[in-house]
């Protein structure tokens, strides 16, 4: 392979040199990356997952039939024919993300074994966070089915992309209220009554009672654990507890994730002084993750730089499959 000679490829900031990794060793194991990736995922295990591994193509078509109805049968009259125009959900596989490091030979000779663990965990976490962020972004399609994967979930967030996406907040005076930007103040905190109202909206949408989950930001954990109906995960049976699971309320499992999106930052919120984050009440079929290539690890020796190029990558797509099965509760991050 021809040597890479561009200055942008090899700069002090783009490589792991002796100074940056003086106490590590560059052994990267693919299975460790996969383990770290799976451990870091929070949203992905709670939504519908499809595997396209080994299959060609870039679009998945999922049939989405319309529910039929029962009709009264009259004597000597033909049955009622139902001819619904069925629809489908399409998932475009176009999310390709990578994590790369260029590791110099001198580091391999002089470093300690913990570098491998650091890089594998870092790669797994970075890729898992990207997948979770995209699933959270797909929540902008709750209600309508039309979502935006470019909406920011950190930094400057105005909140406008989340309006109308089955998004609510608990108004301190009026209870559960549809969210619009510049409305949430520090007093609009989570309440048990507000959560029950949100559950009722999901019930009214004819969403199955099973396979529901509530994914919350860390700031909401204390309020959830203080509700009368909270049941700690410590009191479950001997089954393995999933990552992030802290308990349940009204039979709905509660998961804590630091990846819960920033809906509106404090600077953009003209009426409040705190960031506004989104907690997701979802049914498993509300969102779908399709993986055409799970986490893959590759290495290539770059002789011209006496270094090893390590890359981990993944290829996937996301979609709002049953948009009526997802709701977002905006809470002040206090």
Where are the language model's segments positioned?
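Long, contiguous amphipathic alpha-helices that act as assembly "spine/axial" helices in icosahedral shell
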Residues: 59-64, 86-152, 203-218, 254, ...
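Alpha-helical scaffold segments that mediate packing/assembly in large oligomeric complexes
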Residues: 106-200, 328-334
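Short, catalytically relevant binding-site loops at active-site mouths
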Residues: 141, 219-223, 260-262
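Glycine-centered small-residue hotspots that permit tight backbone geometry or close packing
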Residues: 74-78, 206, 250-256
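N-terminal low-complexity, intrinsically disordered segments
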Residues: 56-87
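Short, charged/polar N-terminal "headpieces" of proteins
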Residues: 47-52, 199-201
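Hydrophobic, aromatic-enriched interface-forming segments
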Residues: 182, 186-228
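Sequence/fold signature of self-assembling virion shell proteins
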Residues: 2-46, 53, 63-67, 87-93, ...
